[in-house]
UniProtKB/Swiss-Prot annotation:
Pfam families recorded: VEFS-Box, Zn_SUZ12
Span list, region VEFS-box: 520-596
GO molecular function: zinc ion binding
Taxonomic lineage: Eukaryota, Metazoa, Chordata, Craniata, Vertebrata
Protein name (database record): Polycomb protein suz12
Quaternary state and interactors: Component of the prc2/eed-ezh2 complex.
C2H2-type ZnF: 405-428
Organism name: Xenopus tropicalis
Amino acid sequence: MAPQKHGGSSAPSGKPSAAASLLPVRKPKMEQIQADHELFLQAFEKPTQIYRFLRTRNLIAPIFLHRTLTYMSHRNSRSNAKRKTFKVNDLLLKVEKMKGDQESHSVSAHLQLTFTGFFHKIDKPSQNSENEQSSVTLEVLLVKVCHKKRKDVSCPIRQVPTGKKQVPLNPELNPAKPSTFPSLAVSSNEFEPSNSHMVKSYSLLFRVTRQGRRDFNGLTNGETNENIDVSEEPPARRKRNSSNRDEGDKTFVAQMTVFDKNRRLQLLDGEYEVAMQEMEDCPVNKKRATWETILDGKRLPPFETFSQGPTLQFTLRWTNDTPDKSTAPIAKPLATRNSESLPQEHKPSSVKPAQTVAVKESLSSDLQARKERDVSSEPRQKLRIFYQFLYNNNTRQQTEARDDLHCPWCTLNCRKLYSLLKHLKLCHSRFIFNYVYHPKGARIDVSINECYDGSYAGNPQDIHRQPGFAFSRNGPVKRTPITHILVCRPKRTKASMSEFLESEDGEVEQQRTYSSGHNRLYFHSDTCLPLRPQEMDVDSEDEKDPEWLREKTITQIEEFSDVNEGEKEVMKMWNLHVMKHGFIADNQMNHGCMLFVDNYGPQIIQKNLCRNFMLHLVSMHDFNLISITTIDKAVSRLREIQQKVERDECLAPPSDEAFEEPNRTTSSSSSFMETNGKDRVVENDCVSGQPPKHSKKQKP
């Protein structure tokens, strides 16, 4: 009743109440839209991050090559025409030729250095133009680090001077001829491997000396009277200090490796800028002068070092007698490695000698011509493609139209629309891609594949390995044995765009994964460690008898001193027999004895060990391991084997050995057939170590 009374009030008071009642109704709609948008972003974010990671991983350690796929055959630019004439011996000849060319290039080539200038912009310019210094003295030394001998504390170093040049100081970067710059050549004889066992590495040592300039007051450039200490130094000490080093001179040094200890060339053709380091003011002992690099403790950023100096710029070339060709590859800056396809007028201009530019153009012309030929031979398919992302059957986002055929997730250039759609469907199966025709190109609808099996289908061994194992793989590795069940493999149909159209409602099962890998992981029962793929065929609980264990057992039995030789032989055969078949229970001994007679019966008869074997059976009976029935069966079986051996010997043709030696088998058999009344005597003889007595009766 109260709401009705409140509703009968005046009209002006009713409108604000209606507006107040509508505001809470709009807020849930905006929150729901934002929540749906967040769910949309989360649904597409996880697969996108996964495919971005897989892209980086495939670049480092690819699982397969895209050019080998059927729908990417246009990416394979190689022809198999040379396979018909291919021979394995050609590989060795090719490698030897390449190795010989590299050695000849590295040794026979002369090292030519052309110095552009020495740049040092920290000092303030002098007011007197007459005393302005325009050059510095550069000394180039070839440092040879030799192998250390036993008596040497450190590796001996040999310094070979190659020459001195006057290098311009802070020259203006204007185009100039190469002849205007000082150049220096290092002969190839210095790098000859005549004493290669002595020299370990070769380095170039640059030593720049900048002489001090003095004005009319006798002060060096950049100094004033304020810099002089109040307490003047005595003339004698000042004279003594000036004798060690010229006052005002500055020395800058730098070192670069030419050949390392493995005789690999480290300096290629190109333009270099080396950061120099100033040596501290310290007295040098002329009797034992050695070159040292002493840091001043001031760490400058790299850009500040090369912008202010001191730096030395030079051009390095490996040349032969012909000055127009180079024998070593060119070390180009990083910024120009991918700029070969740009026109010449669009390339940034820089101060380079004409010879260096000619060499770079000659080396890169073949590669550039081949790239242009490959690109021009294939007509480019210009299509405007845009992607439309769907979530809950509603369009959430649409990308801008692109005129290329690159995959948005792995940036692979598919070059054809059919190849792009096939790649998206097979390599990015976490999404569903539907092709929609467009007059100017194509539209691809992207939605989440709800039927995708996101369980781990890779190698289960990788889960238990350390992080980063996938990137540290060096070559092929053995994987778990796998069996794929092919549900259906029909005849390959002709490529058609209709297979990428939107599927019907009854074809949802086609998005499901039909076959999966062997993702089971087994563990050792004794150590609980994962079973590796190479251990799948071997049972860890199976007690085998390796060769080393058999030899160890025989050696230990030979060391026994309280048994005779016959007992040792029976013990060896019995222990190896038990190890091979793995008898571990008492109820297995009856079967083990019969199996032992079948396997080792001929050896027992041949070595005349029948009585020793009888004692072994009696000993096992004393420990309740076998029964009397087993002893009777074993003895009967042994007699059958003995009679068979005798029959074979009678049928065999007589030999010289048969006349020289008596029939041992007959003697042993007659002795074995003695009555049980003599068993005690036999036992006493065997224990005492005496050989068994043979019967004098011989069979006719």
